[in-house]
Structure formats: structure tokens, C-alpha cells
Regions:
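Primarily recognizes the serine-hydrolase "nucleophile elbow" in alpha/beta-hydrolase
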Residues: 108-178, 187-188, 192
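Short beta-strand/loop motif that positions the catalytic acidic residue
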Residues: 205-207, 211
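Conserved alpha/beta-hydrolase "acid-adjacent" motif
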Residues: 212-218
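N-terminal cap/lid segment of alpha/beta-hydrolase-fold proteins
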Residues: 20-49
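Alpha/beta-hydrolase active-site loop
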Residues: 97-118, 259
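Short beta-strand element of the alpha/beta-hydrolase
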Residues: 49-60
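Short amphipathic alpha-helix adjacent to the substrate-entry channel of hydrolases
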Residues: 67-86
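C-terminal catalytic histidine-bearing segment of alpha/beta-hydrolase fold enzymes
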Residues: 38, 220, 227-280
Length: 280
């Protein structure tokens, strides 16, 4: 793996996965902890046009997880003309972090990406946040939670994404919801379900009806509240599927959710119909 400098102050490691270039960019440092973005640039290069971006947050209950969870989705959407970014963030097992620190990192990542949009060759008005489970919570929370900003962040730069793609997101953290035993009464300012507001970005949600962490009724209620504030929220519920059904190892539903995501992104003007890319 060869080394180069992406910006004067930020070390970038450049490599290849399955023939696709990827960059690792340091976006945040907390004491001795360094957090990186893994960037898959759009393979479609147009000198006068910057690409939309999709930013993926891995799942794992804010406890653990791997930045590689959405690697296959990133490879697909980079071929479709998006710059795809996999975010590493602090978790309990590796960093002794709280969910609140995980959210601070997610917000820092979006701000970094938007601040460096020119360097990354992306359109700062077309940034999609995506994630699964706790990563889905983080993606949603960057859009609608006002609190939990890192003290070193430039809060003049918006951390609000322009669209959301959520895979069985644990977006109810209130009493009876996911993580309440850790979040406690802070859910009032941490739980996306309890903070939906006017201007929330267009959203698509994927869920299995056998999910043991996210009841279908919760997702339906989320959709209802989104529509009450006049924000779009598409919900796809898959029969017989449990938590994590969308991952690449479950190829049938990986393909279905990628296809629906593609259609959604076309509908909001973030993708064109062409070029056709086989989902595999």
C-alpha cells in the first residue's frame, strides 16, 4: 500500500480493493485515537460536475462493528457515479466510548466531508447518510439531533445530510426502545424518533418483519411522524427477515435493498438512470 498526502495536514493511505481505488483519510483525532474515512471515489469522472456522496456508518450497537460492513454497497454505488465513504467511529469495546461519543464522531465525519467537498470532488448539497442498526441511528441522528457536537467541530458547517438511507435503524431510544438502559432520560435529545422536525431530509427505511430489535410498528410510526412534518419517508418491510437481513452474505436481500436504494436516489435527483451496473 503506497502513501501520499491528500491534504497538507492529513495523511492518506491509498490502496485497491477488487480493482477499485480507495483512500483512507484521517478526519478526527481524540487524544491518541485516530479516526479514518475510507473513500471510494466515483468511477465516473466529469470535469464540470461533482459527484453526490453516500456516507456509511456500520452497525454493532455502538459496542463494536467493522467499517467493512458496507464495502459491497460502496463498490456498487461508486460505479453508479457516487463517491462512497465508510466511516470509522468510536465504540465501546475498542475505545470505551459511549453512544453519545459515537454520535459526536458521526457528526464530525459529515462536517469534515462537507468542508472538504472540493478536495473530495463531491457536491456538498448531495450528501447521503446511511447505516445499519446503530449505524442507522447515527445516520438519522446527524440529520435531526441538535445536541452532541464535538467541542472542536466547526458548527458553522452543517452536519445535516441531504438524504437518508436507513437499514433496520434503532431510531427509538426511549423507554421500551433500543438502548434505553444505556441512554436513560437523555433519549429526549438523542432518540431520532423523539426529535423528528420540519425539514428532515427525504428518507428510505428497510426492515425485516422478524426484526427482534426494531418493531415494524416503530418504523411505521416513524414514517407517520415524518409525513406529518411533510418530509418523505419510504418504508420497505421484508417478510420473514430478521435484523441484519440486508448484509451482503444474504445476497437476495442485499440486491433488493441496493436496487431500491438506487431507485430512491434517482427519484430525488442524486443519480441518473445510466450507467447500468449489475448488482452482484
Amino acid at each position: 500500500m503506497k502513501k501520499r498526502y491528500f491534504f497538507t495536514l492529513f495523511l492518506t493511505l491509498t490502496g485497491f480493493i477488487n480493482g477499485f481505488a480507495q483512500d483512507q483519510i484521517l478526519y478526527k483525532k481524540i487524544d491518541t485515537t485516530q479516526l479514518y474515512l475510507t473513500v471510494y471515489p466515483s468511477v465516473i469522472k466529469e470535469s464540470t460536475k461533482k459527484s453526490p456522496a453516500i456516507v456509511f456508518f456500520f452497525g454493532g450497537g455502538w459496542n463494536n462493528g467493522t467499517v467493512k460492513q458496507f464495502e459491497q454497497q460502496a463498490l456498487y454505488f461508486s460505479q453508479r457515479g457516487m463517491t462512497c465513504i465508510l466511516v470509522d467511529y468510536r465504540v465501546k469495546e475498542k475505545h470505551k466510548a459511549t453512544p453519545f461519543e459515537s454520535l459526536k464522531d458521526a457528526k464530525s465525519a459529515i462536517r469534515y466531508i462537507r468542508a472538504h467537498a472540493n478536495d473530495l470532488q463531491i457536491d456538498p448539497s448531495k450528501i447521503v447518510a446511511s447505516g445499519g442498526s446503530a449505524g442507522g441511528h447515527l445516520a438519522a441522528a446527524t440529520a435531526i439531533i441538535n445536541d452532541y457536537n464535538e467541542s472542536t467541530d466547526n458548527t458553522a458547517i452543517s452536519c445535516v445530510p441531504d438524504a437518508l438511507v436507513l437499514f433496520n435503524p434503532v431510531f427509538d431510544n426511549g423507554p421500551g426502545g433500543y438502548g434505553y438502559e444505556r441512554i436513560g432520560e437523555a433519549y429526549k435529545n438523542f432518540s431520532p424518533l423523539h426529535n423528528i422536525k420540519s425539514g428532515a431530509p427525504p428518507t428510505i427505511v428497510f426492515l425485516g418483519d422478524k426484526d427482534h430489535l426494531v418493531p415494524v410498528e416503530t418504523a411505521k410510526y416513524y414514517k407517520t411522524i415524518m409525513e406529518k412534518v411533510k418530509s418523505r419517508c419510504d418504508l420497505f418491510v421484508y417478510e420473514g427477515q430478521g435484523h441484519g437481513f440486508f448484509n451482503y452474505k444474504n445476497l437476495e436481500y442485499y440486491k433488493k435493498t441496493v436496487s431500491e436504494t438506487d431507485t430512491f436516489l434517482q427519484s430525488i435527483g442524486f443519480l441518473n438512470k445510466d450507467p447500468f451496473v449489475e448488482i452482484k
